[in-house]
């Protein structure tokens, strides 16, 4: 056992590594200031009758959009969030390590979705936790800030007409814009052997991106062990080439070692804005439409506090922006009459727009892990050794309590599979047979979209340097098997299996049917099997092997392909990254939104969340969702910049002639009638392009 671990085991963890940083103060976590920072949140349910923008979902993307769009004081913004504020459980949100030991999963702050039984995963129903609180899943997740690769982002941009807006240069700038990066403390960097490049980061954004204030010594063995089995260290994992081994940045505020999430980053530091209202405990029940020039137009949004409660309606002057996530956004579209015709009719919903792709192309990262006993202290064993009673845990963070798992590697197909070129060709050749048997839709458009995603994955991604398997070191899993354990996880990054979600009721409070079709394509089973073999090999490689004792799961008896496949079908789980259910694809390929994020057939409804990604990235989705939301805000503002400028001029003129006549922003309408947004040209137009260029500032 390492001496440092022996020492720490005998010391109260509140006093461990009590570094003073004083960097990047976050007023949200100054509890004396918190009351001042609640002023954009509506606690009594009183809102105006209409808003320019109604954002559905106050999660990761929704609060970014609310903050950015309300920067224009002549624009009114409302956020409707189904969950509560989270203030009653703030310590469980704020303290990073509580995501493992004292989390909100399974509480009223978790949507607690569940898949239907998965035939290729031992007929199990698999839990899908999602954050039901201001901040959404950014308030309960593992805080990884891992970006996709340049190749993946450019591949996304290539799938849709005029998709160059979403190319790497633009998304890279948007992800940098979202963050304030702080390098690791010197002792943390030395312990973990962290490599990074300042040039890949932003230093003035709302979200804090940093590292824990304390580092477990086993993390320092991570990259050397991977190097010893021919996986290189990534010197700049956030710069577009994020394959190889590294220690990931995390959404941690190093001023006080707390979680940085969309609420604490984008909303609470704001001064009071009369043009911004955030209404918690407001579940959107449907979007209200009317026929107008330019297509079906959203005129309002209905919402209720809970099932059976009286519904209220708020009018929309400009746009409805769905940011309810990969489950919520397609469900809201479907109960509003936008989706596959057969699904809507079966659920008793009047069809407004028959759009077959809504809820289709659903993808997720699936993971399993190999676990060993260890004679060394782990973060989990240290925590439970000091806090056996969770009623006595601290309510403020410390450097040790900021420790979360962050040792990562992205391993490509060629490092996992024997004869990779041959097997990749077999996968590519199977596109038609896979499409004819595995697509859960009767619509030809959805089948064509499946083929497009399949071909891109097989031909552009599979044999590239991009990691097809994420490998993670877990030092927080004490209690599941033994008091002291270490796990190495493998998570499939580019699944060939695609599923769907759909409604079977017109009632938004009835959960949709979620069917990711895990492991339905045999290639996924083979790759995850080989990923687990890689985990076992890594755990038996020095210097990491010094920490490993007996392998207890799956155990040494699991050796053959068949044994591995049987075991992983019984022991694989979501990595909490559902996406692609409102895919940005051509409508002819089952797409739901165009390159401007606008829903096909609707004049003024957009989707801006992880559901629009057309395929899974080799990354955690938090960083690209922040980038997506930053870019979406610029895109939306660019759409209306001329109209808003005219309104501002008109308002200034009226103000100068009658200075005592004031109108509250909450009741202001920017136009007497609903505005139909102009469609941006292929190049987005000079005005919108200029607005997007501001992302780089």
What are these regions (language model features)?
Residues 668-669:
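Polybasic, lysine/arginine-rich low-complexity segments
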Residues 2-8, 12-665, 680-696:
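N-terminal redox-cofactor-binding region of secreted/periplasmic oxidoreductases
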